[in-house]
Structure formats: structure tokens, C-alpha cells
Amino acid sequence: MLGLDIVYRDDSIIVVNKPAGLLSVPGRGDDKQDCVVARVKRLFPDCLDQPSVHRLDMDTSGLLVLAFTQEAHRDLSIQFIKRQVHKRYVALLEGVVPKDSGQIELAFRYDPDNRPRQKYDPVLGKWGTTVWQKIRVEPFGEDKVLVTRIQFEPLTGRTHQLRLHSAHEKGLGHPIVGDRLYGSGSETSRLMLHAYTLQFTHPSTGQAMRFTLDPDF
């Protein structure tokens, strides 16, 4: 078990830069116990037993806030429920996205025949909303294939929301580079999705907190 890239810490909260490939919380099985929560508890033994208030997919990198105290956990959880926490992501999408900006609204749910994939279902699915803006088209990799750099602002927090909104034909129709579930990524490829801004109200001081951390791609 390794350490953490700590962006900010005080007596109430900690903000970390989660690397791609690391779980946010423990999963089932001995091989899924190394995660952000486990590392926080190892470094700070006096913190809550369950400090997590939100998650990033294992394949997604970026900013994650956790609570050290029960009061901070309760306050941050309420902020997430009321959608008072604002997050923005940057991603590289396969190919050239023709439009410059827009809003995606799609309903989806677990695909029981192909977990952990989600599938589009406007009847039984939960609706997710994402605002997006094209940053630029750029060459990527050794072959210099064209990809589109996109900023995402999810207004809801559904599982795989940005990945499905990117890949599905009713969304952008361009999977995120490196996506093994919804795109053409291989088992060794990195998902090019990074949570680069995080805004919330400090649970103890009431101060507006804003963190920005650019991706490494």
C-alpha cells in the first residue's frame, strides 16, 4: 500500500489527487482493499471509519474530498445531495466532435447481462445530465490520431455518467480515449478522464473552497 497525493488537509477534511487505477473505496475481495479510504485511514488513524462522501471511478483520476469528522461528513453529504458541490472534468474523446458545446440528458441503468456496464434505458433508467464544452482538437499518441479535448460539468452523479454520455450515439457518440467498457481501449490503456476542479463550502468554517488540478494528459 502506497501513499497519497495530498492537495489540502485540515482538521475537518482532506482533498487528494486520486490516481487512475486506484479504487475510491474498498471493494469485495482481498485484491480490492487498497483504495483512497484505506490509505487515508492508514495515514490518519483518528479519522472516521467511513470518511468517503463521494467517489471517482477506479479508472478516473482527479480531485476527491474526504471527511475526518462526523460533522464534516454530514455537512458534505448534504451538500452533495443538494447538488451544492460543483465538479468539472477534462477528457480526451476519440475522433473529432463536430459541435462546440451542449447539454446531454440520457437515462441509463445497470446492464444485468454485462456488468459493470450501464445501458441506455429511457423507461427504467435514471436520468443523468451533463453540460459539455469543446476545448480543442489535438493529435494524440505515437500515431498522432485526432482526438477532442472536452470539459464536462455533470449536473447529476450517475455511475459511468460521463463515459456513457460520451460514447452513446444519443450523447456525443465519441468514447473517451482508453475506455475499455464503452470504447476501444485495451486492458493496458489509461482512461483519459480527470476530475480537475472541485468546489464546495467548508463544513466547519463556511468558507468557499475551490481546487483546480490539471490532468497529466
Language model feature labels by segment:
Residues 1-217:
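RNA pseudouridine synthases
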